[in-house]
């Protein structure tokens, strides 16, 4: 089959100047053979042109002759040299044009059908006289295998496949072949970086007037089920409908969908969820039985399906259903042959498809993230209003379920509070400076031109894609491997520091995206391991390479703002490094203070010793589990630790409140006139109050000012109780597993073998489904997701049984090591009379005033540091609001 793969709107390998430029001439056409412009359009005596009522815009479709059974003379056989085509003239006349034979007239006696014949015949959609083979046994679908002739252009296999008639009849379409009647399949046999140079192209460049892509949206997925995928696609479709319903917009309006391409990239043919693949089939984007394993002995690296669908999705009661006759959407589905991680999926998006389409704005969404109904528009608007905006992100929300039912789970509530405060204080502060440390890959956008490398191949994308070669490579160091676990942070840094440029990053509060959050301890531990390690090492990289800001073209004041922000980030990183030590010191000081005579006395001393011992035991347990056990195999232990640290936090909150109240009572009963000013002279009181008000008070005030205070009511308590878990469980596991640089999704690619295509002199044969098979296959795919999913329990495999046995061995090993460590610690404490035993055993009981003074000084420094950092965040958030009032987005 002839290839559609011309370069970026070119024909025959040469670029056709765009309309509206000085180079463009409506009556000229670039001919690759002659290397010069040809004269005005002249009609062929044999070629009949179609007239369509649906649209005046004609797509250069793969000609019908490319899939007949008869021998083909090849794409260049006996063509007249004086035949030329004027695409613009055909576009204006609303006539159908065969864009794959441009510059070459139909032969007088062709061995294949001419372009005047309808593609979809009465019986079969591929040829007049298909060859039938033996029918499949009863019980399966009664398929007829049809052998079809295909032509290749420069070694590339491209097929225009009719969509199932049962789908076609439910949606509006032209009477002739167009983007709604045919799905286009391309078998890519190259690396993403070679896609353009190998003469592959996409449909948007094959229209009589190539379509400009303003928005290029990518949805990356691994093995997400039909519910997660539908949730994302429903949000994307709503955004496209919103932009099509903006008649007064200069950019958008009725035909806005023609400026938007939605790309779905699935990471591995063996990994894609069959129900998700069935949804794509139901939309007409995917067809089973079309893909090939090899083309001329070259392995296929990606299967690319293109279709403009009228079929949208809806989700009710956990079941996905199709909704036909809706706003058209240009879909591009890339099914990678192998599982090569998300960063490789982005290579296909940016290096392969992005180079062909040359979009303005690229939007990145993870499957499972549901963008708000107009969120993508608001992201685009940020770029439209600020020419130097190189990247933007919206607010990531935790999915709370109907009526917030998911908040019953304290883990979900804690993450909800964490996300909210990050979007209220952290992101606005960074946006005010112009540099956001990370644009979440789950929902963010970039200006395509800002990401491009320079002429030497150096730039943001070069650094970003370096992570693909580092992972699993023997030359990669531990620092670089961990750093590229958060490769989106590297991309943000390289974008803002791009040489001789002055791009900035922005936070768009109006754009929201909802995503599922881990609802079990083990899932949370595994997720945060990659987040914490990646962000920590990426932050070190950014601080160490701060000088690269000076190679950019930012103004002096912008660079000064970046310097202030990096000082702030450095202080935060230092506190994060010492978080586990700081928490223990605060715990020790508060529990020891409760043992004083004017507070709890002897009871406080005993409680302090008991909690100190338990603290040590559970912290050691965290270390032992983190260094040897899989979280999935130690779920109960991790859950027990969450409960213990919550109890510790309750005790600390009681201690802080009790000490502050006692200080007030002591001042009231001192015999002097009580006043507020006198109260603040009490160092214990004002240190605690300043710290608490600077943290909790600022959280509340900022949330109210942002008109988003509800998380303070629904999630604040849960967040406070689980704060020690973040410090003593998640941080410990992350640092104990810095050697683990995996993403947790890499697996064996054992997948069904596909047929291959071999050609001679540009032609070959392949098996393709006929029309009856298309309908039966389409019905079968629809049935896959038309009912609620019922999990089929399968007996454990040998590998699973072995893994379970290994979990048991690890559990025994953990118990032995824990007993050994605890008994040795108890022996040392008894011999040395330390760990608080000296306070509850008979003795002098002399206090160490010097140690007490040091503790008070330490507490003062820590609490005032918290106050200053919180106040700085608050000021940044307020400045963001002021700027947002004038900017409008």
From Swiss-Prot:
Lineage of origin: Eukaryota, Fungi, Dikarya, Ascomycota, Pezizomycotina
Entry protein name: Chitin synthase I
Organism: Metarhizium acridum (strain CQMa 102)
Taxonomy, superkingdom: Eukaryota
Signal sequence region: none
Biased composition regions of type Polar residues, renumbered to the chain: 126-137
Transmembrane segments: 431-451, 530-550, 560-580, 606-626, 641-661, 687-707, 716-736, 815-835, 861-881
Location in the cell: Cell membrane
Glycosylation, residue list: 43, 199
Gene that this sequence comes from: ChsI
Topology in membrane: Multi-pass membrane protein
Reaction equation(s) it catalyzes: [(1->4)-N-acetyl-beta-D-glucosaminyl](n) + UDP-N-acetyl-alpha-D-glucosamine = [(1->4)-N-acetyl-beta-D-glucosaminyl](n+1) + UDP + H(+)
Entry keywords, A to Z: Cell membrane, Cell wall biogenesis/degradation, Glycoprotein, Glycosyltransferase, Membrane, Transferase, Transmembrane, Transmembrane helix
Pfam families reported in the protein's UniProt record: Chitin_synth_1, Chitin_synth_1N
PANTHER family assigned: CHITIN SYNTHASE, CHITIN SYNTHASE 1
InterPro entries: Chitin_synth, Chitin_synth_fun, Chitin_synth_N
